[in-house]
Amino acid sequence: MARSLKKGPFVDHHLQKKVDVQNKEGTKKPIKTWSRRSMITPDMVGHTFEVHNGRKHLTVFVTDNMVGHRLGEFSPTRTFKGHPIKK
């Protein structure tokens, strides 16, 4: 079920704080996060995030097309080895 529009997008406070500090300073260092549930907002465009997938952190560079999606969508948790070969 989709989130109500009147509530607005969910972003963890600690993650938003890090983005705001980098925007104020003008730096673009990678931000390491475990918050896969946070939604990508327009002020995150151009930043690089290291999103945890359960085993390691995968690098995600945020572009305009990613706004409105969640960080976890770009860091897959399962590896697909392919369908089994029929004998």
Swiss-Prot record:
Molecular function terms, GO-annotated: rRNA binding; structural constituent of ribosome
One GO cellular component, as annotated: small ribosomal subunit
Region (Disordered) residue spans: 1-29
Gene Ontology terms describing biological process: ribosomal small subunit assembly; translation
Pfam families given in the database record: Ribosomal_S19
Domain of life: Bacteria
Residue ranges with Basic and acidic residues bias: 9-28
Family annotation (InterPro entries): Ribosomal_uS19 (IPR002222), Ribosomal_uS19_bac-type (IPR005732), Ribosomal_uS19_CS (IPR020934), Ribosomal_uS19_SF (IPR023575)
UniProt keyword Plastid, yes or no: no
UniProt keyword terms in alphabetical order: Ribonucleoprotein, Ribosomal protein, RNA-binding, rRNA-binding
rRNA-binding in keyword set: yes
Record-linked NCBIfam families: rpsS_bact
Protein purpose: Protein S19 forms a complex with S13 that binds strongly to the 16S ribosomal RNA.
HAMAP family, per the entry: Ribosomal_uS19
Entry similarity comment: Belongs to the universal ribosomal protein uS19 family.
Name of the protein: Small ribosomal subunit protein uS19
Biological source species: Protochlamydia amoebophila (strain UWE25)
